[in-house]
Amino acid sequence: MALSDSIGDFLTRIRNAQLAMHRATRVLFSKMNSSILEILKEEGYILDYEKQVVDNLPSFIVKLKYYEKSPVISDIVRVSKPGCRRYSKYKDISKAYNGLGIFIISTPKGVMTDYNAHKLKVGGEVLCRVF
């Protein structure tokens, strides 16, 4: 069965694993997922991730992060969906949760956080919101 929204599946797997208090979860491999995972790691939302190949299918093992037995990621939501894309100019990019969270944006200069997109004065597709 083919996925119509691999990013949505990726975010849902992370959300469900954190709610179930799992130490790690497996997500599908893609360049976009790799870019999002790198941002989540840099911003401190996950501990680490590594690529694995099982039965000739590449995937990532994501090591989830907790603080005092609570998930670090309290909210991770897909913003731009396949049926309704959301784009934003750099001037219109607001801070997620008054600066406590981040938006992850796909721009012509690569996938980056809302802060970096605003700093580089570049807009793009708002992929997800993390808090």
UniProtKB/Swiss-Prot annotation:
Function: One of the primary rRNA binding proteins, it binds directly to 16S rRNA central domain where it helps coordinate assembly of the platform of the 30S subunit.
UniProt subunit comment: Part of the 30S ribosomal subunit. Contacts proteins S5 and S12.
GO BP, sorted A to Z: translation
Disulfide bond entries: none
InterPro entries, per database record: Ribosomal_uS8, Ribosomal_uS8_CS, Ribosomal_uS8_sf
Keywords: Ribonucleoprotein, Ribosomal protein, RNA-binding, rRNA-binding
Natural source organism: Wolbachia sp. subsp. Drosophila simulans (strain wRi)
Record's protein name: Small ribosomal subunit protein uS8
Family: Belongs to the universal ribosomal protein uS8 family.
GO CC annotations, alphabetized: ribonucleoprotein complex; ribosome
GO MF assignments: rRNA binding; structural constituent of ribosome
HAMAP family: Ribosomal_uS8_B
